[in-house]
């Protein structure tokens, strides 16, 4: 089930109304507007809560997204490139968020660095089509994944802070 903090986060992200994917042309433009509004609201909420942890941008068509996410541990910032494509069957199918530089470092990842979200996130997404969008995928998918996986990867020495990497060279 969803904990109280997650419920609070979700309640502050606008729900989307337009059920449209990249093939739906005019409706897709409307959906993209809703996506951007939800993302802007989510980022603003995070900044107010001193919990700013990602930046995203897209190509002109809104079908390819890329940016950075970060995780703080022991007062050190670990930053990662993220990317994903909007599936043709979106919003029925959730985007598969990838962190390519972490590929092969954890079992909770698929080929290409796509993070594993099947057990918890995908059923929740399926029950909330078309209300959930990219901001929800970040809040319910990537955010919790980073919170669990990155500390584990750091403790195993599989992820190092960029300052530590430079000192070793």
From Swiss-Prot:
Supply the Pfam families for this chain.
UFC1
Q: Name one GO molecular function term.
A: UFM1 conjugating enzyme activity
Cite the entry's keywords alphabetically. Answer: Ubl conjugation pathway
Does Translocase appear among the keywords? Answer: no
Alphabetical list of CDD domains matching this protein: UBCc_UFC1
Give a GO biological-process term.
protein ufmylation
Q: Where is the active site?
A: 116
Q: Which domain of life is it from?
A: Eukaryota
Query: What this chain does, per the record?
Result: E2-like enzyme which forms an intermediate with UFM1 via a thioester linkage.
The entry sums up its family as follows: Belongs to the ubiquitin-conjugating enzyme family. UFC1 subfamily.
Q: What is this protein called?
A: Ubiquitin-fold modifier-conjugating enzyme 1
Could you tell me which species this protein originates from?
Branchiostoma floridae (Florida lancelet)
Tell me the lineage of the source organism.
Eukaryota, Metazoa, Chordata, Cephalochordata, Leptocardii
């Amino acid at each position: 089930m969803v904990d109280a903090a997650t419920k609070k986060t979700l309640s502050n992200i606008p729900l989307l109304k337009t059920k449209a994917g990249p093939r739906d042309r005019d409706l897709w433009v409307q959906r993209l507007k809703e996506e951007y509004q939800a993302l802007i609201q989510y980022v603003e909420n995070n900044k107010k809560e001193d919990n700013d942890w990602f930046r995203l941008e897209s190509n002109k068509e809104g079908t390819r997204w890329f940016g950075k996410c970060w995780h703080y541990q022991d007062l050190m910032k670990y930053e990662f490139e993220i990317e994903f494509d909007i599936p043709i069957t979106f919003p029925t199918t959730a985007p598969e968020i990838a962190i390519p530089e972490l590929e092969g470092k954890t079992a909770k990842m698929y080929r290409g660095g796509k993070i594993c979200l099947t057990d918890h996130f995908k059923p929740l997404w399926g029950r909330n089509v078309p209300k959930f969008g990219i901001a929800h995928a970040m809040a319910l998918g990537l955010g919790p994944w980073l919170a669990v996986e990155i500390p584990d990867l750091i403790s195993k020495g599989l992820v190092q802070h960029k300052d530590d990497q430079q000192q070793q060279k």
